[in-house]
Curated annotation (Swiss-Prot):
GO biological process: killing of cells of another organism; lipid catabolic process
Gene3D superfamilies recorded: Phosphatidylinositol (PI) phosphodiesterase (3.20.20.190)
Name of the protein described by the UniProt record: Dermonecrotic toxin LlSicTox-alphaIII3iii
EC supergroup of this enzyme: lyase
EC number: 4.6.1.-
Catalytic activity: an N-(acyl)-sphingosylphosphocholine = an N-(acyl)-sphingosyl-1,3-cyclic phosphate + choline; an N-(acyl)-sphingosylphosphoethanolamine = an N-(acyl)-sphingosyl-1,3-cyclic phosphate + ethanolamine; a 1-acyl-sn-glycero-3-phosphocholine = a 1-acyl-sn-glycero-2,3-cyclic phosphate + choline; a 1-acyl-sn-glycero-3-phosphoethanolamine = a 1-acyl-sn-glycero-2,3-cyclic phosphate + ethanolamine
Amino acid sequence: WIMGHMVNAVKQIPTFLNDGANAIEADITFKGAVPTYSYHGTPCDFGRVCIRWEYFDVFLQTLRDYTTPGNSKYYEKFILFVLDLKTGSLNNNEVRKAGENVAKGLLKNYWNNGNNGGRAYVVLSLPDIAHYEFIRTFKEVLKAEGHENLLDKVGYDLSGPYLPSLPSLDSVHEAFKKAGVDGHVWLSDGLTNWAPLGDMARLKEIVKRRDSENGFISKVYYWFVDKYSTTRTALDVGVDGIMTNFPYVIIDVLNESGYKDKYRLATYDDNPWETFKK
């Protein structure tokens, strides 16, 4: 999975897809518990415009257009999107309400209330393992609305907080248990593109846990990868996905002699909740 990073304005969507992405990531900002904009703000990655945005509902409707067969904007290879949910400032009650609002927003504006909506898979990424109630409420709303089947298309990523230090993987696992999640787990690690590349120790730990006999992680992705050398290193570690500002870089590496026989671009038929066994 090649995930175009910080795709927050609708006009950016075809640009990233044409550059080689088969997935995108957008930043969802809230007013209270209400998801309002796809917007990142400053600071952001080097070389990017930080302030592009769209209204949340319009953004989801546009994603639906690009992922609904028969629509004039349909891209067959666009198979997944990540919603980076900026819930960091919300209290517990707001987190639960935010889960309800995001569920209703996706149901109405992306899934078209279950009537020929978008077909892409969705990963809900939350910045704090304490926000597991978001996931519980999200799931409850879809069940109550009679669309529990749509949960087959939804995965989850609990990734922080980053300060004072990242939670242990055991703590992350416990948060998923509290959320009622068993499977459909994506986990990530990474650095902004202006930071020096570290030793990827946590990434290696996540991959090892994914591949363990009792691993709770379905897929692992790394961000933000803009260099050819970093792409090769991440692939050598064994990631399933890469988030990038330059999808064509990842495509180029996938076509290199050392990688084209080991990796390929994911398609819609590849299950994003199934751990690949070598």
